[in-house]
Amino acid sequence: MALSAYAAASESTEDENVIRETFDRLDQNIRNEDCRDTFPQEYKAGAVSHGRYMICLNSVACARGYLDGDKADELIRFCMDRIFGVLGHGDDGIIHEMRTLQGEYIDSEEGHRINPGHIFESMWFVLEQAERVGRPEYAERALHTISVTYQRSHDEKFGGILHMLSDNGTDEQYKDWNAARHLKWDEKVWWTQAEALCALLTSADRTGDSAAWEEFKTLFLWCREHFFDPDYGEWYAVLNRDGSPRMKLKGGIQKAAFHIPRALYQCSCILKKYVAETGDCDAQT
């Protein structure tokens, strides 16, 4: 993803071979069920995890211009098939974070975990690619999944999107895999909100659904009030459930210039197009 963006911005061809070699290794590893996850604590023999297919889908889509297009699209379809055929099946709109390869439950904290941020992120990736790669039915499922995930994860009492859920509702037993972060299930985390904004606005743009538009506005205004620092800029990393900053630090483990700039840029592009087409001053504001 990064090498492809650099190549496009610099108009340099020096990294194209590295991009293709990296894709070939990714294509091999993502299909190998015995290939351990980057994070060893996330690896479970006989299990597959949502995150690997979600980010593979987007990385390949970003790098497609430097790859064999047919091979890239086949891998994108493979990832979508795993997401909807193994980690999410049926019409309940739920994508689980971990399942067996046969789509069966794993009776553990990870097995019952629902990660709203991963789901929102995954679904707007799907909406961007599904029709182009010949999986239009997944676009419809993605729209439904975004709606269901928002209804389950939006905190009606305090606002914002909850960090983690279980398939039985909110799970107060959630423990973050990184002890240095020790995030709690009910906290509000920067990247989860950013991906939710992107998914909700992409859904509203695709469908014209006023409910999705209102959900986006509600979440955006909440983020603007609670995450954004009006004095020094940028977003705080983590908020308590009530919307107060858990810490004043802006950076931290994994919080870099990625989720927030990407989501806000993506949203601004959609809104600019919408304003140009409709002249809606509310959206412009």
Predicted stretch roles:
Residues M1-T285:
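Glycan-recognition and catalytic cores of secretory/periplasmic carbohydrate-active enzymes
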